Amino acid sequence: MVKYILLSVLWFTGFFQQQNNAKEIVRISDERMRGKSMKGEMILKVVRPEYTRELDLYSWAKGTEFSLVEVLAPAKDKGTTYLKRKKEVWDWVPTLERTIKLPPSMMSQSWMGTDFTNDDLVKEISIVDDYDQTMLGEDKTGDRMCYKIQLIPKANTAVVWSKVVMWIDKKDYLQLKTESYDDDGKVANILTCSDIKMMGGKLLPTTMEIVPTDKPGHKTIIIYKSREFDIPISDDFFSTQNMKNPKQ
């Protein structure tokens, strides 16, 4: 009897440590990928069966609550800006000379014609604190061995996905692949990160590609041209007044 009790205690201890390790891996990865603040230039490609649209963007972000994105090119979209301040989103459209606050009815619509929604921008969900993490094992993505970790949203957490599975590089804790599952348990979209380089003092994937599984020929690609991390930036920078001509 004592033997079985000891075995049970050892199994539970090992299971508890494994789950703690999964959460710690996700925490380290999240900190390395995000930083406290960030700014940088990127190319956004929207790929559809009929066309490919490309935008040159500059973005600023602070934590999960503040972000500002300015369109640099093409010329017809230049000067358009998008502001996220906590749970609210605004557009500045130069041709209309108007700042437009997005109503709740528009939050589920596509952001800039991409495979992201406006709602994706305003969510402040933490993959560390708002999910329960479980280690599924190890798996290879490309030429890198990764931790394969399942994330299940905690009760009362307002998220779209029923679960998320992440592949986090064992060596550098980079998030290289993420599968998001719908309520039916099917993969809704797949996010892959590649082209790992030094940028802004961090070793990071510089290309991100999201593919919705139910829309053949659709994908959105983000290619980072430059990134700076942990820069001093005031909350006041993220204001509607600053949208017309962002300066930092």
List PLM regions with ranges.
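Acidic/charged, solvent-exposed loop-and-adjacent secondary-structure segments enriched in E/D, K/R, S/T
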Residues: 94-123
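N-terminal mature ectodomain segment of secretory-pathway/periplasmic proteins
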Residues: 20-95
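Short hydrophobic/aromatic-rich beta-strand segments that constitute the beta-sheet cores
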Residues: 40, 67-71, 89-93, 99-101, ...
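Gly/Pro-enriched, hydrophobic low-complexity segments
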Residues: 122-124, 142-240
